[in-house]
Amino acid sequence: MASLVAQANVELPEIDWFALSPVLVLIGTAVAMLVVAGLTRPWARGMYALVTVVGACTAGALAMVLWVEVSNDGPRTIVNGSLALDHLALWGTITICVAIVLAALVTEDYLRRESMDGPEVYALYLSAAVGGVVMLAANDLVVTFLGLETLSLSLYVLASSHRRRAESTESGFKYFILGGFASAFFLYGIALVYGTTGSTNISDVAGVLDAEVLLQGDDVMLLAGVGLLLVGLAFKVAAVPFHFWAPDVYQGAPTPVTAFMASAGKAAAFLAMLRVLVVALPSLADDWRPVIWVLAVASLVLGSILAVVQTDVKRMLAYSSISHAGFILVGVEAAGHVGRVNDGTASSALYLLFYAVLVIGTFGVVTLVTRTGDGATDIGAFRGLASERPLLALGLTVFLVAQAGVPLTSGFIAKFGVIEAAVDVESYAIAIIAMVSAVVAAYLYLRIMVSMWLTGTEEGDTEREPVRVPLSAGIAIAAAAAFTLVFGIFPGWLIEASEQVAALAR
């Protein structure tokens, strides 16, 4: 093979394997688990989850080591400029690894309860994580698309993984069809950007735009390409008006999968959006920033209002996630202002980490309350939870008040950060809308808390299946609650770390 390459005068890129180690560990863990599980007897109880957790922790630890290296040596590109090694990529990698660990712990008992034991779901978590990491670290739009498709295909299968539930199959099919359209828009956007600038490399695109060497008429095609890129990314983050898939998919998918989708999937898509807009298209900020503004306002307003009128908790949380997407878009909009990239980028990245932990903790409790069949997701299922499982109700209360933005929780720090970033760039209108949206959404969380703490069980409720709290899910929920409170009270270290995220490889 080496002689053939030499004869063809093909120059292979130098590869820094250690820089790729988090991705390689995730891939290796998924492949090894599938191969070994296929060649041996069924593994002991909980082993699939344990292997997944170990793999994700190892990848996260390697990302932390690389963080120190990048802090000392500065950001750079790797694999011939197709991937970026910077704090944004490593922050996203760590966020996704945290999501894998928590989701795997919540999933372990769920799969056994639903008679779905097997390594497939865990392997799909890992493959989705690989796609997400590649997507957010990509320094080339084609590589971004490859990561996007790897992430998306894994999530499509995960959404439909509960084959005995028609709702799960329907949600996976719907997500696949609509996601295919979004991917097509994104790919066509890449084609238009390439046709205009002559490159798909993010750094090269930025160089061409900064040099202002576009031919007459090319600016229209370029703006069309940027618009199509935003359509594809807005679909993945479930921003209004590209949110229509989220409520049905969140409701129909297995609850732990919904948690992973809302955390890791959203983090990857948002960080990829930040990289594309801030690195490749800063010279077009005056063109894309108003679009982000409209998406943010629409998501904040519609997400909060529609969440309040729902009676199914998973649909409530789906619309709530749309509202949270609006908050993150507030940070993205702030990052589009000249000279203030750091504030918006750092606040968005911090929000994504805090939200990932919050949403998995919330869905972890929902997973336990819905019981066998994953169908009891009406708000009435939470009646009297405080009297039956007071610690579980307390944990859910922590997550809900954090999502509402109550002080001394990580949710308050996250929301305060993006609103402060908007105020700093004088986007006062969107900051006010965000604060009003937070007040409206608080009513949603209050409804669930009232059902848990102030509403007693009704006749017939005593016959329902009791709520079990298995060890693995209990650890995940307790860890998420502790994280929410500790970094809500002492956020300084993470805030300082997030401020380094804006130093992007170019």
Language model: regions and residue ranges:
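Alpha-helical transmembrane segments of multi-pass membrane proteins predominantly involved
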Residues: 1-506
